[in-house]
Regions:
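N-terminal basic/disordered segments at the start of proteins
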Residues: 1-64
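N-terminal ordered "arm"
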Residues: 33-36, 43, 56-92
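A general structural signal for short secondary-structure junctions and capping/turn motifs
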Residues: 52-56, 99-101, 286-287, 388-392
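Residues at beta-strand starts and edge strands
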Residues: 58-60, 105, 292, 350
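Short loop/turn segments at strand-loop or loop-helix junctions that form parts
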Residues: 64-69, 111-114, 356-359, 402-404
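Short beta-strand elements
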Residues: 66, 312, 343-345
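Active-site-facing alpha/beta catalytic cores
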Residues: 70, 77-330, 373, 381, ...
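Non-transmembrane, aqueous-exposed alpha-helical and coiled segments at domain scale
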Residues: 316, 322-354, 360-409, 466
Length: 468
């Protein structure tokens, strides 16, 4: 029998990827302050997301999850307004969701890596530059990106700043998705100016025309579109990696409608990273006791027996929608490793959402020294992921992307054929390279073709047997 869970039982377990704070008393005071703050999300919203993901796990939906690699307290470009960046991200995200919904004829569950993605695991605890060694940048919630001793010192006050930024971002997102901006009648207005000249823009315009015609037909038939909230707004959920557990513990509250149930109110969904998914460690211990839907990042080092053990710990009731397996294997390894993983999970009857993260396994260093991700490798992993699920008879249920609504140049390739030469003026990420708006929409149309082909295959009647 596992030990009775409380919000702080994780503190008795081994832990990785958490910084050493010089002032423990200051950290404890900040965590106490956070515990008195209002929740960012509500348990009922997390339950709604879990229900929607449960339908995805059963093959009745698709998960679109994406956003910044790491959010920043200050925008990387001084002339960018934060509100505009949030709006532009949402515009691209809504475009992608419309493309996928239309192609798959399935509801698309929309989950952003936003309003809380401020902490990042690192492969090395220190970073060297010009002969000087300092602690690695671990995200704005922990320390600063500037390469100096003061900035790189973990600062507890940053936890409060992260809460405030998350609250402001979430408030703006709620206003956009429920205040009319996400109205399907605005489908044409979501296109960003610099995307209008892109090779995929005419495909999106054609799709927008078909949607507008369908809405016009429905109105002509007497349907009052204003009385259907599902056409005027959408459900949009937030997520981030559950990495800085002191922050997550402070944001965990008992569900007032279901005593004894605990919800981490920093986001609707949390995930456990590839570097922190050890079954007997702190991050798994914390996550097993909260009711939020959870993701598990599965990289090349993931072993099937360990994965099954994680599923037993984190989802002992085998609840649909509780677990999303976010596979980040790389274009070269996904075809070899994913089939065995799928078979192991299916053999045990585990209900999960299978999601493809084609970003993290395809990171390289360019000739000019920039960290980048070739777009063709990203596409290759996505194609192989869905091909494996088609071959195994399982549902490839989603994608998990690092992306932005900005006109950056961080991933090479795509319709505009971005190269190293473009990085000099348009490389703005504080951590890992992201798909820009055009590349994100390019990927959505590729996914649309894969989902449409899958839908056609499922709908095609089997040939009648001879003699029947």
């Amino acid at each position: 029998m596992p030990e009775r869970w409380t919000r702080d039982t994780w503190r008795k377990k081994p832990i990785l990827q958490v910084p050493e704070y010089p002032d423990k008393a200051a950290l404890a005071a900040v965590e106490g302050q956070l515990a008195s703050f209002p929740p960012l999300v509500f348990a009922g919203e997390a339950r709604n997301l879990k229900k929607a993901l449960g339908r995805v796990a059963l093959g009745e939906g698709f998960l679109l999850q994406g956003g910044d690699c790491a959010e920043s307290f200050s925008e990387p470009s001084a002339n960018n307004v934060s509100a505009n960046n949030i709006r532009d991200f949402l515009r691209v995200f809504l475009q992608m969701a419309v493309v996928l919904t239309y192609a798959a004829a399935l509801p698309v569950v929309k989950v952003g890596r936003i309003a809380g993605q401020f902490a990042k695991p690192r492969s090395s605890p220190t970073e060297k530059k010009d002969g000087k060694e300092l602690p690695s940048y671990r995200g704005d919630i922990i320390n600063g990106v500037e390469f100096d001793e003061a900035a790189r010192r973990p600062d507890p006050a940053r936890l409060v700043e992260a809460f405030r930024h998350s609250a402001a971002t979430l408030n703006l997102l709620r206003a956009f998705v429920h205040g009319g901006y996400a109205n399907l009648a605005n489908v044409r207005q979501w296109t960003l100016g610099f995307v209008k000249d892109s090779p995929q823009s005419h495909h999106y315009e054609e799709l927008a025309d078909r949607i507008s015609e369908a809405l016009g037909f429905m109105q002509a038939c007497g349907l009052d579109l204003e009385s259907h909230p599902e056409l005027k707004s959408t459900d949009f959920y937030t997520s981030h990696e559950a990495l800085l557990l002191g922050y997550e513990q402070a944001m965990t509250r008992e569900d007032s409608t279901r005593p004894g149930t605990w919800c981490c109110t920093s986001a609707h969904m949390l995930w456990i990273g590839d570097r922190t998914r050890q079954p007997d460690h702190a991050h798994v211990e914390f996550c097993r006791g909260i009711m939020n839907p959870l993701g598990i990042k599965c990289g090349p080092s993931s072993k099937n027996d360990e994965l099954l053990r994680l599923l037993d710990i984190l989802n002992p009731e085998n609840e649909p929608g509780r677990i999303t397996l976010i596979c980040r294997l790389g274009a070269d390894k996904v075809g070899d490793q994913l089939p065995g993983m799928v078979r192991a999970v299916e053999r045990e009857g585990k209900l999960v959402v299978w999601s493809c993260d084609p970003m993290h396994g395809n990171t390289i260093t360019s000739d000019t020294g920039y960290k980048t991700r070739p777009f063709d490798r990203i596409l290759s992993e996505v194609k192989t992921f869905f091909a494996v699920h088609r071959a195994e008879g399982t549902h490839g249920g989603g994608v998990h992307l690092e992306m932005t609504g900005q006109n950056v140049a961080e991933c090479t390739g795509g319709a505009r054929m971005i190269t190293d030469a473009d990085f000099k003026d348009r490389y703005h990420t504080v951590c890992d390279p992201r798909l820009n708006a055009e590349q994100s929409i390019d990927l959505a149309f590729l996914l649309a073709e894969l989902l449409k082909a899958e839908r056609t295959t499922k709908a095609r009647p089997l040939p009648a047997a001879a003699g029947l």
